[in-house]
Amino acid sequence: VADHKAIATGAAHSDEESVQSAMQLVSEINEEVNRQLEERIRIYEQKILPALRQQHIIFYQSRNVEPFHKEFLRSFFREEIFPYLSPVPVSKDKVISFLRDNRLYLAIRLYPKGDKGTEGQANKGRTPQYFVMKLPYSKVPRFIELPKHGKNYYLMFIEDIIKANIDTIFPGYDVDSSYCIKISRDADILIDESANTSEIIEQVKSKVKKRKIGAVCRFVYDRAMPDDFLDFLVDAFRINRQELVPGDKHLNMEDLRHLPNPNNAVRPIRKPQPMKLTCLDERESIFR
């Protein structure tokens, strides 16, 4: 995909016909990605969550929880999550933070306490500050099991626990809002076809090492993020707007395969069957 984008944007020298073809292909790819994203959200909200509820598994979808869980969340956050959080300031044209490939971050907008701004108008005239904070997956699971209540089991996203306690991270600020973001970096390996075998090996070694620090080829963000918030991040991280992909509130939904099964009511599929693609004729080769 990155190769076609390079042609479409003129980064790679190509004739006009190749550029137009690449632009059309990139557009079709983006449309398909967005279609699949919408379908995934629909399946999650209309099938997975109701199925969990039928098995007495309540999966909180926001920072708002039942009163009997509030003290647990405060304690869990303070003891298990807070020690691993490292907010990094984002300052356009002054500080450029490096976002790691395929990692979830929380983008946060806040205002210094004492900055009154325009009287009678919330946040108007106040100077916002921005931070990003990587979710500590290597230290804490993405999905947290909360204490059982009655016959129900409860689960929660780690990012929602952080949002519920975010004021304690920034005691000198009024937190305005926070949203999940994620970037994907260019992982394509383009090889000089004229190189000999030894040169190709060295090219591959060099390019593999750089895959995690390659150029940003996709910036996924919570579609509920206000336009001015998104504009700031795009400018601060120097994101090409063609790489923007609106997502849902919770990103990296492939992590659902690690969802806890507290009452063993959800039967895991040990040998998942491949999906049948009706658009392909099994009698013909797709390479013809």
Segments the model singles out, each with a brief description of its role:
Residues 1-288:
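N-terminal localization/anchoring segments of enzymes in phospholipid and broader phosphate metabolism
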